């Protein structure tokens, strides 16, 4: 339907797609024996735009893939110390997304690059979770964090492992292509270890069964996820998400693993001819450096799961100096956060070096790592922050060592005194 003869001698042209005449549209473009109107062109552009975003955004996220040095530099801005772990993570993540690029352009006969999931081992409060969160922010990819302790086998009360993929989809507005190239961080992975080496007659619904379910996700499977709205739309088809290219990072404190490592590395013989060795007390940092896959299996992880996490990064225990740095140096440091809160009241915050060291010592004594720093400082400032909104003329709050060690109230400097000084 390209043209029709009207009552007059001139021909009226019609769009070959929608059938509208040249008088009903703004523009009619001619081709070889066909015509297309501006409205049909706009409609085609809209259809193409609706179908492209997920793929194009996923490409954009990796088009400017940062180098390992750039990834580490970003991590340095948020995580103090842990140099070996940051270097290991930077290289592993860079290689993972480089592998995805290779897969898109690879031919049939090319070498197939396999995925390398990551295991982070380190004491509580050493920065495992923060490293994973910062990585995802650096790469601009979908990220979700899951707690392994809440996971159970399918059919039991608790979270199914496929709920992790649903949360990943939610984080990127249900764009399947983007989710398939995201990062999943599973915390407390050590808490789902087998309770014993011998299989029990009772079901271990939150231990080995969960490990088996996670294994399927890690090695790559088609996960069926309810569409947006879930049960509200029971007639909708389930979304199929391929987990082959999702990077899994697992983290855990692995309390007790150091004993397994020591038993392996310091095994001694029995009898009169055996060499007598005194067991030296080693720090967690030194012990974790010697970790081998067999130690993780002995600890309670199934061999198949250990095999799916070839990259192992160990995090060191934080020293007093490192904790002082964490208090002040990172972009979102605890001291900077409290300074910002008090600045909203028009008050300056001064924390003296002796107080910073006292906070670090207290956190070390509590064995909470960097996670305990905020609670210690908050506890010292809670009464002051309660009174500040109703107290006038306060210019500065000063926290010294006695505030932390002896629970004395911080020193308040008033505006008149500040002017005289």
Swiss-Prot record:
One of its GO terms (molecular function) is protein dimerization activity. Residues 3-56 form the ClpX-type ZB domain. One of its GO terms (cellular component) is HslUV protease complex. SMART domains: AAA, ClpB_D2-small, zf-C4_ClpX. InterPro entries: AAA+_ATPase (IPR003593), ATP-dep_Clp_protease_ClpX (IPR050052), ATPase_AAA_core (IPR003959), Clp_ATPase_C (IPR019489), Clp_protease_ATP-bd_su_ClpX (IPR004487), ClpX_bact (IPR046425), P-loop_NTPase (IPR027417), Znf_CppX_C4 (IPR010603). ATP binds at residues 123-130. Gene3D superfamilies: 1.10.8.60, ClpX chaperone, C4-type zinc finger domain, P-loop containing nucleotide triphosphate hydrolases. The keyword Chaperone applies. This is ATP-dependent Clp protease ATP-binding subunit ClpX. It comes from Polaromonas naphthalenivorans (strain CJ2). The gene is clpX.
């Amino acid at each position: 339907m390209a043209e029709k003869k009207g009552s007059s001698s001139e021909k009226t042209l019609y769009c070959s797609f929608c059938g509208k005449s040249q008088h009903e549209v703004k523009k009619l473009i001619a081709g070889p024996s066909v015509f297309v109107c501006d409205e049909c062109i706009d409609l085609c552009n809209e259809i193409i735009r609706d179908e492209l975003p997920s793929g194009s955004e996923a490409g954009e996220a990796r088009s400017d893939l940062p180098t390992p040095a750039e990834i580490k530099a970003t991590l340095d801005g948020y995580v103090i110390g842990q140099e070996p772990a940051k270097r290991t993570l930077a290289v592993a993540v860079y290689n993972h997304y480089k592998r995805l690029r290779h897969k898109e352009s690879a031919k049939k006969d090319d070498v197939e690059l396999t995925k390398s999931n990551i295991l982070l081992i380190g004491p509580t409060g050493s920065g495992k979770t923060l490293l994973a969160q910062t990585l995802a922010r650096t790469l601009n990819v979908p990220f979700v964090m899951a707690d392994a302790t809440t996971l159970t086998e399918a059919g039991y009360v608790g979270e199914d492992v496929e709920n992790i993929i649903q949360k990943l989809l939610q984080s990127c507005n249900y764009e399947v292509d983007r989710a398939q190239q995201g990062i999943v961080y599973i915390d407390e992975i050590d808490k789902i270890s087998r309770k014993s080496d011998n299989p029990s007659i009772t079901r271990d619904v939150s231990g080995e069964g969960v490990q088996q379910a996670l294994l399927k996700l890690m090695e790559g499977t088609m996960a069926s996820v309810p569409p947006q709205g879930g049960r509200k739309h029971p007639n909708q088809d389930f979304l199929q998400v391929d987990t082959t290219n999702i990077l899994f990072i697992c983290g855990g404190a692995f309390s007790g693993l150091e004993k397994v490592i020591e038993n392996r590395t310091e095994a001694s013989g029995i009898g009169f001819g055996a060499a007598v060795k005194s067991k030296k007390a080693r720090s967690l940092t030194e012990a974790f450096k010697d970790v081998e896959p067999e130690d993780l299996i002995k600890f309670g992880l199934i061999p198949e799961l250990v095999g799916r996490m070839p990259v192992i990064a160990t995090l060191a225990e934080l020293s007093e100096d490192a904790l002082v740095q964490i208090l002040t140096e990172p972009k979102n440091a605890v001291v900077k956060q409290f300074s910002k809160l008090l600045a909203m009241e028009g008050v300056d915050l001064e924390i003296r070096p002796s107080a910073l060291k006292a906070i670090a010592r207290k956190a070390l004594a509590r064995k909470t790592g960097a996670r305990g720093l905020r609670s210690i400082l908050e506890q010292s400032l809670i009464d002051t922050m309660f009174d500040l909104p109703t107290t006038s003329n306060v210019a500065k709050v000063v926290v010294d060592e006695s505030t932390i060690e002896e629970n004395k109230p911080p020193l308040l400097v008033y505006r008149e005194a500040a002017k005289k000084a």
